[in-house]
């Protein structure tokens, strides 16, 4: 029988991250792999969703997003980023940020166009490039070393990646999997290259509220769209998932100039029609939460980060301290395993903890063969139980 699967679908595998969740369930391991909380979503946000269902907001919303939700997104963007967004012309609501990214790439990339991505990178971007017939160009994020205490890129390498075929660059800040928060200076350098080469910036900012202040180093989240010259050439992608601990709701959005949004809306319409109407209404409530909510979120995740950082370090891992998001990349070379996949299988089956093989974040598996990623968006009891199991490695 002929192969009935397309060449595109045959050129990538299922998500390694989500496979690790399935293996954690199969073997009864504690899941520190996939980035979803195991603690309850905020009660008031859940109540807003229930109220919306009871109010019979259960039919299709406008394809590109319910009016009230788009207005709420625009209002939050104004107070948080200082940007005036037209909710009727510059926003599209999608089924999660995952759909926002693929819809954007399908809308703006032509066959053979190049998209630059920093490596290591979130695994979805590879299939997104394949599905949109675009070519990925990779720029290395170097791990902290003698030249820099944080993950960093080489400006010369980045400049060399831009050429006449460059259509876009993907920037994830705070970054998954490294936890890097791009500085204003780094983003300005990227912005200048985008302007010089007439390229778009596709920014994945789903962790915009999950970063850890450091006065000495000036850690802050900077949105690319706020930089001079970038308002109309940036597609800002976001969602409810991480900020409001509702990863299963699948409600995201993209903000961009009207011509870009028109294209993204067209693709979105025929991909999914629209995001869940009652959950968009709950999003109206979430977007109106006061600054204290975000301060508490930040404090809680910083506390979890600080707890989990100490455990791998005392058991033989070399940890790279994240400045944002809720992941920790670690070096496993001290354990003597052949590669990350072999090590993660050992952790799941013999130790009872599931993490993500580092190779899933690189184009060549050998580049991440001595790395694994931990996730700490979990209950204290979960992290403490995982710590107890990890101490068996000593």
Task: Report residues per predicted region.
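Short beta-strand to alpha-helix junction loop
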Residues: 64-65
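A short acidic, glycine-rich active-site loop
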Residues: 57-60
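PLP-dependent class I/II
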Residues: 1-5, 10-11, 16-28, 36-52, ...
């Amino acid at each position: 029988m002929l192969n009935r699967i397309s060449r595109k679908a045959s050129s990538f595998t299922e998500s390694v991250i989500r496979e690790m969740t399935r293996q954690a369930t199969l073997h009864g391991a504690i899941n520190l792999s996939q980035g979803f909380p195991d603690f309850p979503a905020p009660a008031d946000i859940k109540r807003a969703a229930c109220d919306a269902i009871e109010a019979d907001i259960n039919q299709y919303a406008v394809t590109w997003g319910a009016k009230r939700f788009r207005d709420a997104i625009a209002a939050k963007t104004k107070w948080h980023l200082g940007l005036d967004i037209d909710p009727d012309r510059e926003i599209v609501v999608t089924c999660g940020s995952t759909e926002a990214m693929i819809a954007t790439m399908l809308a703006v990339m032509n066959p053979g166009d190049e998209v630059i991505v920093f490596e290591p990178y979130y695994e979805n971007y590879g299939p997104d490039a394949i599905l949109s017939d675009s070519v990925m160009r990779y720029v290395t994020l170097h791990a902290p070393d003698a030249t820099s205490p944080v993950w960093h890129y080489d400006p010369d390498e980045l400049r060399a990646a831009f050429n006449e075929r460059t259509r876009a660059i993907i920037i994830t800040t705070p970054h998954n999997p490294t936890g890097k928060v791009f500085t204003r200076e780094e983003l300005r350098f990227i912005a200048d290259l985008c302007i010089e080469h007439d390229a778009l910036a596709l920014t994945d900012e789903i962790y915009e509220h999950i970063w850890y202040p450091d006065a000495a180093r000036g850690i802050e989240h900077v949105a690319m769209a706020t930089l001079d010259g970038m308002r109309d050439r940036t597609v800002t992608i976001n969602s409810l998932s991480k900020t409001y601990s509702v990863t299963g709701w699948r409600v995201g959005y993209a903000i961009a100039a009207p011509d870009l949004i028109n294209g993204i809306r067209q693709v979105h319409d025929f991909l999914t029609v629209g995001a869940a109407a009652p959950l968009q209404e709950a999003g109206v409530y979430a977007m109106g939460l006061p600054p204290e909510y975000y301060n508490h979120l930040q404090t809680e995740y910083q506390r979890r980060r600080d707890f989990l950082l100490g455990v791998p370090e005392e058991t033989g891992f070399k940890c790279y301290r994240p400045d944002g998001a809720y992941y920790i990349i670690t070096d496993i070379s001290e354990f003597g395993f052949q590669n990350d996949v072999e090590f993660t299988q050992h952790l799941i089956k013999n130790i009872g903890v599931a993490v993500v093989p580092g190779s899933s974040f690189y184009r060549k598996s050998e580049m991440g063969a001595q790395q694994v990623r931990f996730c700490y968006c979990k209950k204290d009891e979960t992290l403490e139980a995982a710590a107890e199991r990890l101490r068996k490695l000593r």
